[in-house]
Amino acid sequence: MRFIAFAVIFSAVYLCSSAFTHPRGEWTKLILTQHWPQTFCKMEHCKTDFSYWTLHGLWPNTGVRCNTSWHFNASLIEDILPEMEKFWPDLLEPSSPKFWNYEWTKHGTCAAKSESLNSEHKYFGKALELYHKFDLNSVLLKNQIVPSEKHYTLEDVEEAITSAYGVKPKIQCVHPGQGGQVQILGQIEICVDRDFQLMGCEKSSEDTWSNDLPTVPVSGQSGLSVCDHSMPVYYPPVQA
């Protein structure tokens, strides 16, 4: 009986301490997500001349649409709009703020549970800061991984990023349809903790975020998912 009582007390203390460390619903990881515009437009049947990786989003690992009454207001980020248009463009509607509105409502309102991200300006500003800090364009170029008709191994891409930042990224591709032998590089995720320190992107049991990219098959191909180590990677060049 004493043992049972002790076990109950111990469990209660453990749960309380865990809740104090990570309050229920609080995120523990941010996923900085960059996508390759050429691959996106292959999936969405659009045309783009962006020749560099652009921001897709900054996503907490738990929660979506945490405060739907907190509406996006572009005037609050007016000073960083030129940078947003350049590095976080809406590839489908370049002159529209719809994409930023969507990202704020779905992910920004959840990121805002942290004091360091508790405003539109803090959230979008931090995403831009991290985008420049973890510069995929420079890292891949430095390792001779450039958009072209040649193929790379997934290990080439992973090693380039891991050697630069010391953590393993999550790399996603458009997979070929039946009989296809080449996957298309589409999206790369780099993760940080609540203090914006790098951490691995391995998915944990508490993660509830999901990929925002469409998963509609294109030309017999599957949607975007984690790249396959056994298959060559195609990094498509800008289409003239």
UniProtKB/Swiss-Prot annotation:
Signal sequence segment: 1-19
Pfam families the UniProt entry points to: Ribonuclease_T2 (PF00445)
Subcellular location: Lysosome lumen; Endoplasmic reticulum lumen; Secreted
Knockout consequences: AO127 mutants were identified based on increased acridine orange uptake. AO127 mutants display enlarged lysosomes in brain and lysosomal accumulation of undigested ribosomal RNA in brain neurons, white matter lesions adjacent to brain ventricles, and frequent focal white matter anomalies throughout the brain. Nevertheless, mutants appear basically normal, reach normal adult size and length, are fertile and do not display obvious gross motor deficiencies.
Tissue expression as described in the entry: Ubiquitous.
GO cellular component, one term: lysosomal lumen
InterPro entries named among the record's database cross-references: Ribonuclease_T2_eukaryotic (IPR033697), RNase_T2-like (IPR001568), RNase_T2-like_sf (IPR036430), RNase_T2_His_AS_1 (IPR018188), RNase_T2_His_AS_2 (IPR033130)
Class of enzymatic activity (EC top level): lyase
GO biological process: RNA catabolic process; rRNA catabolic process
Active site: 56, 103, 107
Catalysed reaction equations from the record: a ribonucleotidyl-ribonucleotide-RNA + H2O = a 3'-end 3'-phospho-ribonucleotide-RNA + a 5'-end dephospho-ribonucleoside-RNA + H(+)
MF annotations from Gene Ontology: ribonuclease T2 activity; RNA binding; RNA endonuclease activity
Transmembrane domains' residue ranges: none
Disulfide bridge map: 41-46, 66-110, 173-227, 191-201
Residues that carry a glycan: 67, 73
Alphabetically ordered keywords of this record: Disulfide bond, Endonuclease, Endoplasmic reticulum, Glycoprotein, Hydrolase, Lyase, Lysosome, Nuclease, Secreted, Signal
Database matches in SUPFAM superfamilies: Ribonuclease Rh-like
Enzyme Commission no: 4.6.1.19
Protein family: Belongs to the RNase T2 family.
Function: Has ribonuclease activity, with higher activity at acidic pH. Probably is involved in lysosomal degradation of ribosomal RNA.
PANTHER family: RIBONUCLEASE T2 (PTHR11240:SF22)
Protein name, entry field: Ribonuclease T2
